[in-house]
Structure formats: structure tokens, C-alpha cells
Amino acid sequence: MNMANLPEVTVRDLARSGVHFGHKISRWNAKMAPYIYGVHQENRIHIIDLRKTLPLLQAAMKVLYNVAFQGGRILFVGTKFQALDIIASEAIRCGQYYVNYRWLGGMLTNWGTISSSIKTLVQYEKVLNAENSILTKKELGNIEKKRQKLDKALGGIREMGAVPDVLFIIDTNKEHIAVKEAEKLEIPVVAILDTNSDPDGITYPIPGNDDSRKSIELYCRLAADSILAGMESSLARSGVKVGDIKDEEFIQEKGDSIIRTKKGRSKVYKEDEKEVVTNEDESR
């Protein structure tokens, strides 16, 4: 398997994105000590050792590449406000799935119920799109409200079809339920761990700032690029010339579905605060 097309990243890139800024020393988790370089004396925040971060990040990128190469499902998870739009846009860009509103208990461990809710969402859409509906304007309005609520929670996983093969998580403290569910089902977790995080149960930890938008953008871009690289290699192995795919469109079979990603969009065709400041925020 040729990984030459994996995205490149350096310690300098990490530093420019503020990945090294941790939390106030009073908020640290002692289990993160191996990844801490020292303390910023003026602001009393921990500084993450980017020499430790880089190889762990590269290892995680290879994992995402391999899962994509094999046609697996990857779920991006990040519900903090700094990450909402980034998580969605990068997951869509690489034809994968995301949760960016709220993690519903049982999203993994009770997939049957979640699937039923997704079917309800689809049914609502059919009713709302039906011509010559016999429903009143008020009834349609109530259905639209229910549709919006379900779409907000489940829109990013509506085409996933089954539990994912790996999770990519921003902020394991906020997404602790997702971590626990993945651990219970033995689903590998790639996660960004800040200095206040618990590394226990994280299969592929990446020590780094999980509050700065600039840092989050870097992680998610690298994750999406690694996934696209894996898909590209898979296509090349099957004899498809990537240069022949129009408009930067990638096609990848997933079970009984074909995922198409085109200019930041994905469709499924069935076949049958740190920067919040700069980490020097006093609230940290």
C-alpha cells in the first residue's frame, strides 16, 4: 500500500496553528504529563511537546488512510461551538459522516433505535415534499419542526448505514459519552487530547490544543486529506485513473452504496476557547 500521497505536516505547521497551547496548569490531567513540554511562565498554561504530537498525529493519519482505503466508515465528532462548521464541512468534503450538534446517548450502542429515527426523518421529508398534500398548513408546520430537530441531530449520519469503523473526535471531555460507547463496542478512537484530557481508552491519541479554531481546522483538514488519499489509492488499485474523474469527484463503494464527493459535497446512491483567543485566555 503506497502512502506517498498522505498529507505532509511539520512541527512548524503545528506551532503556527497554536497546537502547543494547553490549559491553565490548575486544570491539567496528570495522565497527560508525558506529552507536556513545560509551563508558560507569564500565562501559567501548559505547553504541549510538539515533538511528541507530530509522530502520534502522523500515526493517526495513517489509520484514517487505511480505513478509507478499505472502504470503511469514519465518523467525525465535535459538538463544541468552535468546531461545529469545521467538523461538518471537512467530513462532507471527504464523503464521511459527522455529529456536530449533540451526541445522543445510544448513537453507537443503540444503533437500531437511531436507524428508526433516521427512517422517521426520511418519512417526514417525503410528506413535506409530496404534491397535493391533504395536510393543513399547521400540520405541515408541525412536521417541519420535527424534521428540523431530527435533521440537526442525525443529518450527518443519515447515510452511514451502520456503526462506523473509527471515530475522529475533537475534545474527549465534551464527547465522553461517544468515547464510552466506542470503547464498549471496541471501535477505535482517534482523538485530540488537550492538557485537561484523559488519555485512557483512546486508541490513537493526538496531544494538542482542542479549543482554537485554527488548531481544529488543521486537525480536520489533515484527517479529511488522509481519508481522501486512502480513497484515491483504493481507486488507483482498482484501475480507475483519478485524473479521469471529473470536477475533483471521488467515487468509493461502501457496502451496497456508492459515495460521491464533489467540491465539498457528498451524496449516496443506493444500488439495489483558546483561540477563542490564543490559549492565553484567562478563562483557561
From Swiss-Prot:
- SUPFAM superfamilies from the entry? Ribosomal protein S2
Q: Which domain of life is it from?
A: Bacteria
Gene Ontology molecular function, alphabetical: structural constituent of ribosome
Transmembrane stretches, start-end: none
Q: Which GO terms describe its biological process?
A: translation
Tell me the keywords, alphabetical order.
Answer: Ribonucleoprotein, Ribosomal protein
User: One GO cellular component from the entry?
Assistant: cytosolic small ribosomal subunit
Please name the Pfam families in this protein's record. Ribosomal_S2
User: What family, per the record?
Assistant: Belongs to the universal ribosomal protein uS2 family.
Descriptive protein name: Small ribosomal subunit protein uS2
The organism is: Wolbachia sp. subsp. Brugia malayi (strain TRS)
Lineage of the source organism? Bacteria, Pseudomonadati, Pseudomonadota, Alphaproteobacteria, Rickettsiales
Query: What gene is this protein a product of?
Result: rpsB
